Regions:
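Alpha-helical solenoid repeat scaffolds of the TPR/TPR-like class and their adjacent stem/linker regions
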Residues: 1-407, 412-479
């Protein structure tokens, strides 16, 4: 019997050949435009390719033809989540669960939606319900571990991830997520090997050939390349001097973002190249964030002392451009939001890290201070008469400006790592679930002696924290 177009579409979709699957399902729909299953399956293939508007069109059409289908509603909810429509997704999944209280996928998807909505304990309950109904699986335990990690219920999170790995030891998502929970606990020696599993998740290594495993380099050439964010680059270059100490004859090449090149020129005996350029010949390569593993970094061996300096001439030039120093007033650098990460749920992390400007504003009111914006982009109109916005070219400029300030107050972004690396007092406005290298609790950082961490008491609730910061700021001595 010959294969039907619908069967061919399903086979191709199962093989992750989604473009071809879409063509097959479209063939079905040319024959019967009312085929809700073909619409549903084509929508799913469109979603796999992140063709979200087309997926939405297909799912809505399928739902109109079969309004009682829980599977259509579940997938539509997942799509709405990807579009950032969390309330709509939640309501749709609750509708499914009201009709089918034992719908496992609805419980799992609701848990993910509630996690993005910052309702971490509620998300945990959803994932526990899914596990109770369907039993343990790597995916369900990973979901549970993620919600527990966000809730900072870290011992429980570690247990969930470890249970998942007992079922599927090669699951990179479980291994990497376990490393994050361990990092939050300061269990670095256990975390670093698992952190290497990031390359089996959505992250893709820039280079794969000849990875350095920590062996003696002699006079060989090692390419170290930046990965992930600018803050990660600024944080991890601290380990290059120790690498040089252990391999004094090796030639070290650092491929980093353009914004870091001028600042990193101060690193002795390091050849710098732009990250996007073809690297010079090398014998081995290593992603920058694998250095802690190769150097066996623990809390006991981690130094919190400054390791970068601002260029004196550049600092002097910027000092002349900043608001003139006045007795009794502080110069304070501020960052209230990070740059856009994308659209829909892709921007969730940025939104969660950032303080809405209306909630940040009380920090600027009635304060004997001159505020300097350290974030890129045009200054909002509401800040024009409150904040000085220098035209910053790169991190050499930012470092020079920071060196002329009394304090930096910033959300979790690259600026806090730069301020800490310079030894400048920096107050970090930290979201409730924290971040891997900021520990789960405490006001100090093992990475930066000059850092004070202000932590949200409840997810998404910035006003009480901003009020506390403002109160403390007013009490600081002014010379």
């Amino acid at each position: 019997m010959s294969e039907t177009a619908f069967e061919r579409g399903n086979r191709l979709a199962a093989a992750n050949q989604h473009e071809q699957a879409i063509a097959a399902f479209s063939e079905c729909l040319r024959r019967n435009a009312q085929d809700w299953q073909a619409l549903f399956n084509r929508g799913t293939a469109q979603m796999r390719l992140k063709h979200y508007p087309l997926a939405l069109e297909d799912y809505l059409a399928a739902a109109a033809l079969n309004p009682s289908s829980s599977n259509i509603k579940c997938n539509l909810a997942v799509l709405l989540k990807e579009l950032g429509e969390l309330a709509l997704a939640e309501n749709l999944l609750l509708e499914v669960l009201q009709a089918e209280p034992e719908h496992v996928d609805a419980w799992s998807n609701l848990g993910v939606v509630l996690q993005y909505a910052l309702r971490y304990d509620d998300a945990v309950i959803c994932h526990q319900n899914a596990l109770q109904l369907a039993g343990a699986s790597a995916g369900r335990l990973n979901n549970l571990g993620n919600a527990l990690t966000c809730a900072l219920r870290l011992d429980e999170a570690v247990n969930a991830y470890q249970q998942g790995m007992a079922l599927q030891a090669d699951d990179a998502f479980l291994g990497f997520n376990l490393s994050v929970a361990l990092l939050l606990q300061g269990r670095y020696r256990e975390a670093w090997p698992l952190y290497e599993q990031r390359w089996g998740t959505i992250m893709q290594p820039r280079y794969r050939e000849r990875p350095w495993q920590g062996q003696d380099l002699g006079q060989q050439r090692l390419l170290i390349w930046a990965e992930q964010g600018l803050g990660d680059t600024l944080q991890m270059v601290r380990f290059l001097p120790e690498l040089q100490r252990r391999h004094p004859e090796a030639r070290l090449i650092l491929a980093c973002q353009h914004a870091c090149l001028r600042l990193f020129a101060q690193l002795p005996n390091i050849e710098l190249v732009p990250l996007e350029d073809t690297p010079p010949p090398h014998d081995w390569q290593l992603p920058l964030m694998s250095l802690p593993l190769r150097l066996d970094v623990t809390l006991a061996t981690l130094s919190d002392q400054p390791y970068l300096q601002a260029d004196p001439a550049l600092a002097s030039a910027w000092d002349a451009r900043l608001p003139a120093r006045q007795r009794g007033r502080l110069r304070i650098g501020i960052v209230w939001e990070t740059g856009s990460w994308g659209v829909g749920i892709a921007d969730h992390g940025r939104q969660n890290k950032s303080v809405p400007l209306t909630e940040f504003m009380p920090l600027l009111e009635d304060m004997d201070a001159d505020f300097v914006s350290l974030q890129l982009g045009e200054l909002p109109a509401t800040l024009q008469d409150k904040v000085f916005a220098p035209e910053i070219g790169d991190f050499a400029d930012t470092a020079a400006i920071i060196s002329q300030l009394d304090l930096v107050i910033s959300v979790d972004t690259s600026v806090v790592h730069l301020a800490g690396a310079l030894g400048k007092p920096v107050w970090v406005l930290m979201r409730a679930e924290s971040a891997p290298f900021f520990m789960a609790q405490g006001e100090t950082s093992p990475w930066y002696a000059s850092m004070h961490i202000w932590r949200q008491a409840n997810p998404g609730d910035w006003p009480p924290l901003i009020a506390s910061v403002a109160k403390t700021l007013r009490q600081l001595p002014r010379d």
